[in-house]
Design a protein with these regions (language model features):
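N-terminal helix-turn-helix DNA-binding module of bacterial transcription factors
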Residues: 1-67
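Short acidic/polar active-site loop segments enriched in Thr and Asp
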Residues: 24, 70, 127, 188-190, ...
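Short acidic capping loops at alpha-helix termini that bridge into adjacent secondary structure
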Residues: 189-190, 221-225, 275-280
Length: 347
């Protein structure tokens, strides 16, 4: 396409830039946000196309004027979930790139997200909804009443099947298997686990993944080494203290979130134990805080930017083109830190 042809294209979008450049939407997003993980020649190629086409990200006056008619609602279940806090930044950015504004609705962990969504639909009338977290049971019972295109982000379940509900996330069971297998590879056999109850789908899948890894290694999953914790610092701190009070013997801990890992590490240190010298700890999520803890937490990183972009892209396709719902499972990454070391025996 020549420069003159590009200049004739009105209302260019990020999808147009991706198509013309031959790059992915996520790559265009990284260039717009001046991310360093783009090759210089690719970045210059994309910027040249933007200059020639007169493309400007959708933060101009025209976009603000139509913002109300192009709104999405992000229903966040869990006010203290730091992964969701990090993820929301990516989600808002992705929505803006596609020309939509995001309205955030925070709910307590025990709230019914479907009831809240029905109320939002009556009051705001958004074009679509993205749920961050949720109860599979609540969706099974009430999602049929949600009439707008929707996406369940960070959770993928084969127990849900609705024509207007896409899902984007990682395989929680396989990801937990990776985490615990990493501990086992370091020689750990007595592994404690901190996570939520079986009524929580992610917690249930992550527990099964931990069990799978231990069984694959010929080890027994010890139910007495499982501590119930919400996904917040205080709950994790008390859950770890509960395990320590029972004089449970373990050399490693799989925490079902980085927040749980931080709370647990604080309890271990308060009890006079060292991480990782006495107890190795691996987390889950890859939140920013995990990289600034002492020690740096070894964790399973959920690709939050990819999840956000895929979630918004699927939602926009449903809204603008009537596309069918899809399920997208993305691959997490084991990010080594300083909180895991080879086993040296029980503490």
């Amino acid at each position: 396409m020549t420069e003159s042809e590009r200049c004739k294209m009105p209302n260019m979008t990020i999808k147009d830039i991706a198509r013309i450049s031959g790059c992915s939407v996520s790559t265009i997003s990284r260039v717009i946000n001046d991310r360093p993980d783009v090759r210089p020649e690719t970045k210059e190629h994309i910027l040249q196309i933007m200059r020639e086409s007169g493309f400007v990200p959708n933060t101009n006056a025209r976009q603000l004027k139509i913002q109300q008619s192009r709104s999405l609602v992000f229903v966040v279940k869990g006010t203290r979930n730091l992964f969701f806090s990090d993820f929301l930044v990516q989600l808002q950015r992705a929505a803006t790139l596609y020309g939509y504004s995001g309205i955030v609705s925070y709910l307590d962990e025990n709230a019914n997200e479907i009831d809240a969504a029905e109320k939002i639909l009556r009051e705001i009338k958004p074009k679509g909804m993205i749920f961050l977290g949720g109860s599979v049971t609540n969706f099974q019972k009430g999602f049929a009443n949600i009439t707008v295109p929707s996406v369940l982000a960070t959770l993928v379940s084969d127990e849900l099947d609705f024509p207007n509900l896409s899902m984007v996330g990682v395989d929680d069971r396989a990801s937990a298997h990776t985490a615990v297998a990493h501990l086992i590879a370091q020689g750990h056999q007595k592994i404690a686990v901190l996570g939520g109850p079986a009524t929580s789908f992610p917690s249930r899948m992550r527990r099964l993944g931990a069990q799978d890894a231990m069984e694959d290694a010929g080890l027994r999953f010890d139910d007495t080494l499982y501590g119930l914790s919400n996904y917040d610092f205080e709950s994790a701190y008390h859950a770890m203290n509960g395990l320590l009070a029972k004089r449970a013997e373990f050399t490693a801990l799989f925490a079902m979130s980085d927040v749980i890992a931080v709370g647990a590490i604080r309890a271990l240190v308060s009890a006079g134990l060292r991480v990782p010298e006495d107890v190795s700890v691996i987390g889950f999520d890859g939140i920013t805080m995990s990289r600034y803890c002492v020690p740096v937490i070894t964790t399973i990183v959920q690709p939050s930017e990819q999840i956000a972009l895929q979630s918004v892209e699927l939602l926009v396709r449903q809204i603008e083109h009537g596309a069918p719902a899809q399920t997208v499972t993305l691959q997490p990454e084991l990010q080594p830190g300083e909180s895991v070391r080879p086993c040296r025996g029980n503490f």
